[in-house]
Curated annotation (Swiss-Prot):
The keyword Mitochondrion belongs to this UniProt entry's keyword annotation: no
Name of the protein described by the UniProt record: Ribosome-binding factor A
Source lineage: Bacteria, Bacillati, Bacillota, Bacilli, Lactobacillales
Role noted for this protein: One of several proteins that assist in the late maturation steps of the functional core of the 30S ribosomal subunit. Associates with free 30S ribosomal subunits (but not with 30S subunits that are part of 70S ribosomes or polysomes). Required for efficient processing of 16S rRNA. May interact with the 5'-terminal helix region of 16S rRNA.
Matches recorded under InterPro entries: KH_dom-like_a/b, RbfA, RbfA_dom_sf, Ribosome-bd_factorA_CS
UniProt cross-references to NCBIfam families, sorted A to Z: rbfA
Length: 116
């Protein structure tokens, strides 16, 4: 039963953080950032927030990470207004590499098809 609640809270945080980044955070470093997944710790005290950014440049990725870290307080405050939870979890932002990994596999599969 608890797993369903953890999943629901994670989905709600994902939706709200995406909305907050688009509407409330004005930092240009986080423009184009999309939240792809939120993994909650079992006691709901920590949320790992995975994000992607449209740019492949390492400098843009670093700027986005810095911008998200700077905006964490604003995001938590806005989450507190939107969610009915006793304690808003701490947020840790990590780059989601699964999309790049999937693109790499697609490219390898296409290369195999060309060889045949």
């Amino acid at each position: 039963m608890a797993n369903h609640r953890i999943d629901r809270v994670g989905m709600e945080i994902k939706r709200e953080v995406n909305d907050i980044l688009q509407k409330k955070v004005r930092d240009p470093r986080v423009q184009g950032v999309t939240i792809t997944e939120v993994q909650m710790q079992g006691d709901l005290s920590l949320a790992k927030v995975y994000y992607t950014i449209m740019s492949d440049l390492a400098s843009d990725n670093q700027k986005a990470q810095t911008g998200l870290e700077k905006a964490t307080g604003t995001i938590k405050r806005e989450l507190g207004k939107q969610l009915t939870m006793y304690k808003i979890p701490d947020l840790v932002f990590e780059k989601d590499n699964s999309i790049a990994y999937g693109n790499k596999i697609d490219q390898l599969l296409r290369e195999l098809d060309k060889k045949d």
